[in-house]
Amino acid sequence: MKDKGYLIQRTTLLMKHKIEIVIPKVENIEIELDDSNSPNTVKKFVENLPFTVGMNLWGEEIYTDESPIKEKEENAKPLVELNDVAYWPSGKAICLFYGPTPIGKKDEIKPYSPVNVIGKILKPEKSVLEKISDGLEATFQLKK
């Protein structure tokens, strides 16, 4: 009797969450979180919804004041891609990258220090994101 070879494939379910960032007097931002890179960070993010934080700018990055999320580095990346959404463990902040940062070289988006990538910006266009100014308050909530 011959042994039959079987390929056993494990599948993991990718969890996605649509989040709305409500900013009074500015168009809302829609992001989509997925747990493929930093599942623990995404889980803590969703568990803490809704929350309201101040917003700040650094180059073409929007980052929040300290959020209620407390997570260590989880597959943290020193470089990110255009429209990445990340959690910055050092500052307990949420970061939205829509272009270059002051310390990135040409055509690279470099966070201040490594970040846990947790999703992507879906809407709006960059021209709307550029209208956000330091100090605006934003509420992160599940999209209805």
Regions found by a protein language model. Name each.
Residues 1-3, 117:
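Intrinsically disordered, low-complexity segments enriched in small/polar residues
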Residues 31-44, 48-144:
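Glycine-rich active-site loops that engage anionic ligands at enzyme catalytic sites
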